[in-house]
Amino acid sequence: MTKDILILAVETSCDETSVSVIKNGRDILSNTVLSQIESHKRFGGVVPEVASRHHVEGITATINEALGDADVSIEDIDAIAVTEGPGLIGALLIGVNAAKALAFAYDKPLIPVHHIAGHIYANHIEEPLTFPLIALIVSGGHTELVYMKDHLSFEVIGETRDDAVGEAYDKVARTIGLNYPGGPQVDRLAAEGEDTYSFPRVWLDKDSYDFSFSGLKSAVINQLHNQRQKNIPIIEANVATSFQNSVVEVLTFKAIQACKEYGVQRLIVAGGVASNKGLRQSLADQCKVNDIQLTIPSPKLCTDNAAMIGVAGHYLYQQGRFADLALNGHSNIDLEEYSAE
């Protein structure tokens, strides 16, 4: 009988302290998430120093809670996986140092995991990954299209040239007057409004899979400023609808085109913006028309969590990709350089 593989995973790349125990690469035995949203809300965004302090305060209790929820001891764990980057360096270091301490104290292998690889592997929890596939990455810091021909094989075929989609959502939300985090609130408003503004769709070069959202963001902000200066009433829901439709149309079109060009029948979506209802519906509609299998994680697995790190860590464990105790956090890591090839 094959022995179960248990991975203890740690995620502290931004403003969630999360620890999870994953069995055999898919089964979530525990997934504890300590959110900092309320602490950052008054600042209108994540403050790195505040995030780091909260990670320090919460990491030990979160580890203990995850082990308790999974009903396992640290001795039962086969390896420790941890997000090494990209992310906020101070936040990353809390998780990395905690993982190194556990690996040293209990003589466990240490597995460094790329944060975006984790988001990709959140899909594996919902439905086993089959290859080749296209992954659409949409988050506060990243907007990418990635071609994968096998596990841990990443070829970035498109990326944002300026703002990430989640960043654009947050800035538009602030301009409208919505509280942090703005993305979910824009999505909610968009369901109530009408597409009354002609905001731009930025396609860039012909056949390019790159993205650009700074022009769209500026167009929305300028429109709102002009209306306020002229005392023209603003229907916030219509602004949200028009903005979101512009974003979703571009993301959907390029994702579907990438699937067609690369001859794949599997599209997965990863990152916090993957929980956006408008995007999920648009992709579902177009994948159905084009006979493409679509997988999007449940909303709780779209945002940062350690379960996704544990799943990616499982496949790194199988490949023997371990780190020594000199492992450090990195604010930027290229996904392709992290690829198994």
Swiss-Prot record:
Its main location: cytoplasm. Binds 1 Fe(2+) ion per subunit. It is an enzyme of class 2 (transferase). CDD domains: ASKHA_NBD_TsaD_bac. It is found in: Cytoplasm. One of its GO terms (biological process) is tRNA threonylcarbamoyladenosine modification. Keywords: Acyltransferase, Cytoplasm, Iron, Metal-binding, Transferase, tRNA processing. Required for the formation of a threonylcarbamoyl group on adenosine at position 37 (t(6)A37) in tRNAs that read codons beginning with adenine. Is involved in the transfer of the threonylcarbamoyl moiety of threonylcarbamoyl-AMP (TC-AMP) to the N6 group of A37, together with TsaE and TsaB. TsaD likely plays a direct catalytic role in this reaction. Critical mediator involved in the modification of cell wall peptidoglycan synthesis and/or cell division as well as in the positive regulation of the activities of different murein hydrolases. Essential for cell viability. It catalyses: L-threonylcarbamoyladenylate + adenosine(37) in tRNA = N(6)-L-threonylcarbamoyladenosine(37) in tRNA + AMP + H(+). Coiled coil: none annotated. GO terms for molecular function: iron ion binding; N(6)-L-threonylcarbamoyladenine synthase activity. PROSITE patterns: GLYCOPROTEASE. Fe cation binds at H115, H119, D304. Belongs to the KAE1 / TsaD family. Its cofactor is Fe(2+). One of its GO terms (cellular component) is cytoplasm. The lineage of its organism: Bacteria, Bacillati, Bacillota, Bacilli, Bacillales. This is tRNA N6-adenosine threonylcarbamoyltransferase.
